[in-house]
Amino acid sequence: MKITRFGVSVPDELLEKFDRIIEEKGYVNRSEAIRDLMRDFIVRHEWEEGDREVAGTITIVYNHDEADVVKELLELQHDYVDEIVSSLHVHMDEHNCLEVVVVKGKAGRIKEIAERLISLKGVKHGKLVMTTTGRELV
């Protein structure tokens, strides 16, 4: 892989803050931190394009005592069998459950799945975490 060196002009205060953060996070140098930022920027762009193949997780916390929430959750997951790769179910306490759904597919479709899961009656909190399939990252 060919590496290109380039210069970036930034205010001193911004660079000082950046250097403190990359040291806290354990980066060995600025270049690796900047590469990670560039990769994250590319991944976010992939998600903006609804027809791109992406991956992610949808995490929800719900009250399993809520009428029909478990049934609706299972039905919804079966509606998207091509995009839902797997799921993990955790009993948080006697009433609350955490479900992590691993998804892969077109960005627009993944967002649709997340919106439907998160908006189910009985879901207390939900979050879509987006990432990449890794195919186009170096």
Curated annotation (Swiss-Prot):
Gene3D superfamilies: ACT-like. Chain A, domain 2, Met repressor-like. One of its GO terms (biological process) is response to nickel cation. GO terms for molecular function: DNA binding; DNA-binding transcription factor activity; nickel cation binding. Pfam families: NikR_C, RHH_1. This is Putative nickel-responsive regulator. Transcriptional regulator. InterPro entries: Acetolactate_synth/TF_NikR_C, ACT-like_dom_sf, Arc_rbn_hlx_hlx, CopG, CopG/NikR_regulator, Ni_resp_reg_NikR, Ribbon_hlx_hlx, TF_NikR_Ni-bd_C.
